[in-house]
Amino acid sequence: MTSTPQPSRPSSLDAEIAARLKRSADGLVPAIAQQYDTGEVLMLGWMDDEALHRTLTTGRCTYWSRSRGEYWVKGDTSGHVQYVKSVALDCDADTVLVKVDQVGAACHTGAHTCFDADVLLKDGDSGVPAADQ
Amino acid sequence: MTSTPQPSRPSSLDAEIAARLKRSADGLVPAIAQQYDTGEVLMLGWMDDEALHRTLTTGRCTYWSRSRGEYWVKGDTSGHVQYVKSVALDCDADTVLVKVDQVGAACHTGAHTCFDADVLLKDGDSGVPAADQ
């Protein structure tokens, strides 16, 4: 994409990071939370510039809630805190990967990760001949 | 969110899956590609209903390219194919996690993953006192 929406809200995010961040039309980028030691993908949230800034500077994962329209510090309500271990942007700066140490369940359903319950395909059983794999 | 945009394009996706898929305003959902055995997060792409259908049924990861406005079978140009091992939706059906076996580099830059080059924070060095972690 040749242009990117500007931040929707005021932010203290480092100007150089903000300059290369490529936001969706709603001013957000998807943020993948991954357990730092096991590699499990825990959940995907959304960050605006300020949520990324807070994630980088407070040691706690902070997201922008699209449904509630407010910042959301993971674990503030549930106790299921995500302590930030590392943060990276992807090659075109439109996705964040946060490696975290997750306290308790990552999912609001109580499941360990948000991807445990709704498995569409397992064990590569898509009918593709083994010779093609 | 109480409603979700409908598919933008015709699709053969299973009707029950399509009924619970919660798409962004552009009709897409983010899709995380993770190496199935090492747990590395390789990249994030975008899928519409038909890209998800093809990913579920062909054994190859298929995305919707937002910049080119077309389907994109990972590896068709580069040879860096992603063979599908499993596919899951998250708890609110607005994100896809695809575990894959990645051939070669996942990133178009030649890097192993798309998250290798632009690290914003390492080793939890956010200045949070150790006692709080």
UniProtKB/Swiss-Prot annotation, chains A, B:
Its cofactor is Mg(2+); Zn(2+). GO terms for cellular component: cytoplasm. Keywords: Amino-acid biosynthesis, Cytoplasm, Histidine biosynthesis, Hydrolase, Magnesium, Metal-binding, Zinc. It is found in: Cytoplasm. It is an enzyme of class 3 (hydrolase). Pfam families: PRA-CH. It catalyses: 1-(5-phospho-beta-D-ribosyl)-5'-AMP + H2O = 1-(5-phospho-beta-D-ribosyl)-5-[(5-phospho-beta-D-ribosylamino)methylideneamino]imidazole-4-carboxamide. Pathway: Amino-acid biosynthesis; L-histidine biosynthesis; L-histidine from 5-phospho-alpha-D-ribose 1-diphosphate: step 3/9. Its EC number is 3.5.4.19. Binds 1 Mg(2+) ion per subunit. It comes from the Bacteria. One of its GO terms (molecular function) is magnesium ion binding. One of its GO terms (biological process) is L-histidine biosynthetic process. Zn(2+) binds at residues 91, 107, 114. Mg(2+) binds at residues 90, 92, 94. Homodimer. Belongs to the PRA-CH family. HAMAP family: HisI (MF_01021). Catalyzes the hydrolysis of the adenine ring of phosphoribosyl-AMP. This is Phosphoribosyl-AMP cyclohydrolase. It comes from Streptomyces avermitilis (strain ATCC 31267 / DSM 46492 / JCM 5070 / NBRC 14893 / NCIMB 12804 / NRRL 8165 / MA-4680). The lineage of its organism: Bacteria, Bacillati, Actinomycetota, Actinomycetes, Kitasatosporales.
